[in-house]
Structure formats: structure tokens, C-alpha cells
């Protein structure tokens, strides 16, 4: 019943809502977060309060938390805040043993912190009728007709807060694929770049605020790099290509997970020409199903149900 819910849109510039947020953080029995929130560092939870980290992805190719290479450049005050926030995560929801190990290293947690119930955000992909509906809906919006849809969704890079530069040669992609494909461009909401000039009969720029789970059902081929999208898209078992043009630089500055090249379920390219050749020759990995099974081990379409059961148990114990 939404009438029983109090939606507070948090904004650093909205003092009233900020105070409201802090009130709820200090009075709630169960707190769900899906990212790093510095506000947690300012809260001292009472006994019995459980903060559960849902996270915003069911897998990781880039390092984060204490594993992030840039952590060495942060101040002692920053590190103290990180520690305070991470220590509030009493449970972390995971969809696989692999992701559990990453969380343990990234947040300095142990096995008892892991809630192996599957990732709730993946439940939607198991609703076949809904996915078919979304596929038809978005293909109609794209005017795809008899064409296949390629989605290019690069990961966010820290320097793109000021200005981003797209390395992909879109003219070459159009010459190679415009007869049989459409190229859909989906950038991170924080990226600042003018892409209106890229809108053509071949290239479609999707609003940055459109949720990815809305689009994936309509996608036939995914192109990305270090994003977590492949872990969800792999549930469809459709081809994935990795346009990792700055792999060495990114690994040095931010950090990729160990054995990145062996883990990903598709070929790597560092130039648009290589990428085009890979797509044309269909040199996709044969391990998509194994990759999905491994990283979505506990995600079976019922993770949200198990999450609700767990939360109800916590609330009952609080009575």
C-alpha cells in the first residue's frame, strides 16, 4: 500500500529532506541501501538495527571499496569515513559465491555477512511475458522492424564528470552494420557529452535516465567494457562484446578484477575495426550459459520473495 510509504527524494541542497533522511536512518529497524552512502558514517545504529546492502549490480568487473586502486590517493579522513560506512553493512545480498568473495575483499567482511538469496533486481528477467512485452515495446520505439539491435553501454569513467569523449568510430559502425542493425547508445547518467549529433537512422541515443532493465529484452548484441551489465544480460544468453580500448590505463588507475580477460564471456577489442570484425565473424564466447550460471547461482526469479521473508523475520524479532 503506497499510502503507507513516505517517499523522500534526497538532495544535498534540500535541508528538510536531509534531516528527514537522518531521522529515518536513526529510527528504522531495517535499512536497505544499494550503493555507498556517506550519510551512514554519521549514524550510530542502536542494537538490533540491520543495514542490508543490496548493491546495484549482480557482478563486478571493476574494483571498488578497499580494492579500488585510487584508494591510496584518498585522505585519512576519507578512509575513516569509508570504514565507518562499510562497517554498517551487517548483511550484503549476493547472487553468487564469486560476488560474495568480491564483497568480502572490498568491504572487509566475512562469510557471516553474506545473504545468499539471489539479487532482487534480477527477478524481472525471469518474467517471460513481461520480457516479451518489453522487447516488442522497445523495438517499436526504435522502429527496428526486421533489424537487430546492438546496445553500446560503456562504463562510467571518473574524468567524464567534466567532459566525455566517445572513442568508438560510429561512422565505421554505420558503414558496417546499418543494413541489418540499429545501434542504441546508452550512457551513464553522470556523463556529460552532447550526443544529439549522433542521432541518425542507424544510431539511437536513449535517454540517460531510462533504466537498463527496461531495454535489455530488446537487445540482440551487447557492447560494453567494464560495466556490470553483462552479468544481467547473460541471463538472455545473447552475444556480448567488450570494447576495452583503454584496458591497461583503466586497470592502472581504477583497477579491474583479477583475470578480467579470462572471466568475461566474450572477445575483447581495442579498436573499432577489431570490434567490427569480431561481430561480423560472430567470434562470441561459447561460455555464456556457464558464465550466467556461475554469477547468477542464487538468482532464480524469487530473490525478492526471499528478501521479504528475511525482512519479516527481522521485524518479528524486533517486537
Task: Tell me what each language-model feature is.
Residues 198, 228-295:
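Catalytic binding pocket for nucleotide-activated donors in carbohydrate/polymer assembly enzymes
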Residues 1-129:
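Active-site and donor-binding regions of nucleotide-sugar-utilizing enzymes
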Residues 31-45, 50-55, 209-254:
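A donor-sugar binding/catalytic signature common to diverse glycosyltransferases
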Residues 15-28, 189-231:
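Donor nucleotide-activated moiety binding/catalytic core segment of transferases
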Residues 35, 95-98, 189, 226, ...:
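Helix N-cap/beta->alpha junction signal
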Residues 106, 114-197, 269, 303-305:
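Conserved catalytic-core segment of nucleotide-activated headgroup transferases in glycan assembly
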Residues 29, 87-92, 182-183, 218-221, ...:
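Short active-site oxyanion
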Amino acid at each position: 500500500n503506497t499510502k503507507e510509504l513516505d517517499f523522500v527524494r534526497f538532495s544535498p541542497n534540500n535541508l528538510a529532506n536531509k534531516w528527514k533522511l537522518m531521522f529515518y536512518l536513526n529510527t528504522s529497524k531495517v535499512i536497505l541501501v544499494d550503493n555507498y552512502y556517506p550519510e551512514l558514517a554519521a549514524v550510530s545504529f542502536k542494537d538490533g538495527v540491520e543495514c542490508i546492502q543490496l548493491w546495484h549490480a549482480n557482478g563486478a568487473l571493476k574494483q571498488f571499496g578497499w580494492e579500488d586502486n585510487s584508494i591510496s590517493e584518498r585522505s585519512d579522513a576519507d578512509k575513516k569515513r569509508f570504514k565507518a560506512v562499510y562497517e554498517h553493512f551487517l548483511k550484503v545480498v549476493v547472487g553468487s559465491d564469486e560476488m560474495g568473495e568480491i564483497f568480502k575483499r572490498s568491504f572487509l567482511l566475512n562469510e557471516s555477512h553474506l545473504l545468499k538469496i539471489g539479487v532482487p533486481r534480477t527477478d524481472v528477467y525471469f518474467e517471460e511475458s513481461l520480457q516479451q512485452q518489453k522487447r516488442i515495446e522497445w523495438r517499436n520505439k526504435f522502429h527496428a522492424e526486421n533489424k537487430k539491435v546492438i546496445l553500446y553501454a560503456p562504463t562510467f569513467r571518473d574524468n567524464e564528470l567534466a567532459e566525455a569523449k566517445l572513442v568508438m568510430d560510429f561512422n565505421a559502425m554505420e558503414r558496417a552494420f546499418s543494413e541489418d542493425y540499429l545501434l542504441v547508445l546508452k550512457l551513464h547518467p553522470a556523463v556529460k557529452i552532447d550526443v544529439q549529433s549522433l542521432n541518425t537512422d542507424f544510431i539511437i541515443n536513449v535517454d540517460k535516465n531510462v533504466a537498463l532493465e527496461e531495454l535489455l529484452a530488446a537487445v540482440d548484441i551487447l557492447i560494453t567494457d567494464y560495466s556490470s551489465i553483462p552479468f544481467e544480460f547473460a541471463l538472455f544468453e545473447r552475444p556480448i562484446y567488450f570494447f576495452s580500448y583503454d584496458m591497461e590505463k583503466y586497470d592502472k588507475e581504477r583497477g579491474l578484477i583479477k583475470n578480467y580477460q579470462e572471466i568475461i564471456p566474450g572477445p575483447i577489442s581495442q579498436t573499432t575495426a577489431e570490434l567490427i570484425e569480431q561481430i561480423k565473424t560472430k567470434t562470441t564466447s561459447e561460455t555464456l550459459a556457464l558464465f550466467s550460471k556461475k554469477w547468477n547461482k542464487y538468482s532464480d526469479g524469487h530473490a525478492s520473495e526471499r528478501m521479504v521473508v528475511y525482512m519479516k523475520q527481522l521485524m518479528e524479532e524486533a517486537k
